[in-house]
């Protein structure tokens, strides 16, 4: 459960990300594909090379979804309902992959914003991404 301080940290972090969201999303995806090669199986039609337009485009989708979630942190199920349906029923993504991408997002954010990535912010973002993952996998049952 996100505390009021967590929600403040999440919103402040997403404001600092600003126009870099798409680039950070793509970088996190690249990290995930390199660190956890089995995740590539969900993207057989993608050019997974560094800087590919498809990875950049999907990175933007990830970043936009997370920005929307951060803006609606008090109603994550409502904000992510369509994505939850898509990932559970059409794409059938293994839920563990959300944890892997979350980890790669945290690493990416820490690399780009080391001064702002305090232990408290890290914990808040980790809880936020875990909450997003929980919502995205809630319709698997």
Swiss-Prot record:
One of its GO terms (molecular function) is peroxidase activity. The modification Phosphothreonine is found at residues 8, 108, 134, 137. Red blood cells. The modification N6-acetyllysine is found at residue 16. Keywords: Acetylation, Heme, Iron, Metal-binding, Oxygen transport, Phosphoprotein, Transport. Transmembrane segments: none annotated. The modification Phosphoserine is found at residues 3, 35, 49, 102, 124, 131, 138. O2 binds at residue 58. The modification Phosphotyrosine is found at residue 24. Signal peptide: none annotated. Heme b binds at residue 87. InterPro entries: Globin, Globin-like_sf, Globin/Proto, Hemoglobin_a-typ, Hemoglobin_oxygen_transport, Hemoglobin_pi. Gene3D superfamilies: Globins. Residues 1-141 form the Globin domain. It comes from the Eukaryota. GO terms for biological process: hydrogen peroxide catabolic process. One of its GO terms (cellular component) is haptoglobin-hemoglobin complex. The modification N6-succinyllysine is found at residues 7, 11, 16, 40. SUPFAM superfamilies: Globin-like. Heterotetramer of two alpha chains and two beta chains. Involved in oxygen transport from the lung to the various peripheral tissues. Belongs to the globin family. This is Hemoglobin subunit alpha. The lineage of its organism: Eukaryota, Metazoa, Chordata, Craniata, Vertebrata. The gene is HBA.
